[in-house]
Design a protein with these regions (language model features):
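Two-component histidine kinase transmitter core
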Residues: 224-225
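Short glycine-rich hinge loops at helix-strand junctions in the catalytic core
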Residues: 24, 166, 180, 206
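Short coil-to-helix segment of the ABC ATPase nucleotide-binding domain corresponding to the Q-loop/switch region
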Residues: 106, 168-179
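DNA-recognition element of transcription regulators
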Residues: 104-117, 150-160, 172, 185-204, ...
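Short, conserved catalytic or interaction motifs in soluble domains
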Residues: 68, 120, 167, 181-184
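Short, Lys/Arg-enriched segments at the junction into DNA-binding effector domains
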Residues: 2, 113-169, 173, 221
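Conserved ATP-binding motifs of the histidine kinase catalytic
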Residues: 9, 147, 187
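N-terminal/domain-start alpha-helical segments
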Residues: 1-120
């Protein structure tokens, strides 16, 4: 799981990241809303952790910006604000969950994992049908107009991540961790080669799709205009 953390308090940021790393997850920490918003243009995360009070803006303002851009990444607020009105306001603006500082490590991890599972369940865990494509995670197989295509396991996993997120810009780091794992020593060039192979193997352009390369950011699967 890859987690983006918006937190200006160093001690709380360390608490959150240590809990994540000890459990085998990765994270990036941003101390201001401006730096976080800049990063969200190029980075991709499974879950976001937002503080409320920040040096330059509020976590609510950051959340509004994300939702206005139709970014549906699950959001957990971790804040010292603890009134019922605070919780209601965060949820009303699109937060998915709420924890009061300091969070207990086990509860923090449990809530983050639950948010990730919920997002994955909405994306679908069975056969994924997108246009003429059918992806079956149970057999790591993909069919195009009913024809079984010959893909390696890595090629299939990469295609599945892309087709589960059509229209979403996925960072290179996110794709590397999603397909090759957190600790894999894989160069970004390997990812680029796999993307190039997928374009041909899936016959994307002939079937109304393309994988758009966004310079210095990553890739986006999108329908042809």
């Amino acid at each position: 799981m890859r987690v983006g953390v918006l937190e200006d308090d160093v001690d709380h940021a360390v608490l959150i990241t240590q809990a994540l790393h000890a459990d085998g997850h990765s994270s990036e920490v941003y101390p201001t809303g401006a730096r976080f918003l800049q990063a969200m243009v190029r980075e991709t995360f499974d879950v976001l952790v937002l503080d409320w009070m920040l040096p330059d803006m509020t976590g609510i303002e950051v959340l509004d910006w994300l939702r206005q851009l139709e970014d549906r990444t699950p959001v957990l607020f971790v804040t010292s604000r603890d009134t019922e009105n605070d919780i209601v306001e965060a949820l009303r603006h699109g937060a998915d969950d709420f924890l009061v500082k300091p969070p207990r490590r086990t509860e923090l991890l449990a809530r983050l994992k639950a948010l990730k599972r919920r997002a994955e369940s909405f994306a679908g865990v069975g056969v994924l049908a997108v246009g003429a494509f059918e992806f079956d995670p149970s057999s790591s197989s993909v069919r195009l107009h009913g024809e079984l295509l010959d893909l390696t396991e890595r090629q299939f996993q990469l295609a599945l991540v892309l087709f589960r997120n059509p229209g979403r810009l996925l960072s290179r780091q996110y794709l590397l961790e999603a397909v090759w794992g957190l600790n894999a020593q894989v160069q970004t060039r390997t990812l680029d080669i796999h993307v190039s192979q997928l374009r041909a193997l899936l016959r994307l352009s002939d079937n109304g799709w393309r994988i758009n390369s966004v310079y210095a950011h990553g890739y986006r699967l999108e329908p042809l205009a």
